[in-house]
Amino acid sequence: MNTEKLETLLGFYKQYKALSEYIDKKYKLSLNDLAVLDLTMKHCKDEKVLMQSFLKTAMDELDLSRTKLLVSIRRLIEKERLSKVRSSKDERKIYIYLNDDDISKFNALFEDVEQFLNI
């Protein structure tokens, strides 16, 4: 690998690390949380989605373990960036969704990230 490619790789790493530290300090979130939040925006914006179905999709698309996904989902719910509701017919079923407040927080967060990264 030549020096130019190594410098490019180092630049990506520094940007990744800086973003990770920034969102941790400002929002108390991880990059996994951002990835899960982005995926929920794609799949749960218009309707409530069964948690089990979402976990299967997220495991495939994000290549994260079930445990890491559940940690991120729980953190996002605690930070009020994602909403959940239990089924009235079967209490074992949990649905996740984004309400209007969650969507506005999502947009503000990702606009802030774009500004931070200058993209």
Curated annotation (Swiss-Prot):
The keyword Cytoplasm applies. Gene3D superfamilies: Winged helix-like DNA-binding domain superfamily/Winged helix DNA-binding domain (1.10.10.10). One of its GO terms (molecular function) is DNA binding. GO terms for biological process: regulation of DNA-templated transcription. It is found in: Cytoplasm. Pfam families: Staph_reg_Sar_Rot. Residues 55-78 bind DNA. GO terms for cellular component: cytoplasm. InterPro entries: SarA/Rot_dom, Transc_reg_Sar_Rot_HTH, WH-like_DNA-bd_sf, WH_DNA-bd_sf. Its main location: cytoplasm. Keywords: Cytoplasm, DNA-binding, Repressor, Transcription, Transcription regulation, Virulence. Belongs to the SarA family. Involved in the regulation of virulence genes. Acts as a repressor of the agr locus and consequently targets genes regulated by the agr system such as sspA, hla and hlb. Binds directly to the agr promoter region. NCBIfam families: Staph_reg_Sar. This is HTH-type transcriptional regulator SarX. It comes from Staphylococcus aureus (strain bovine RF122 / ET3-1).
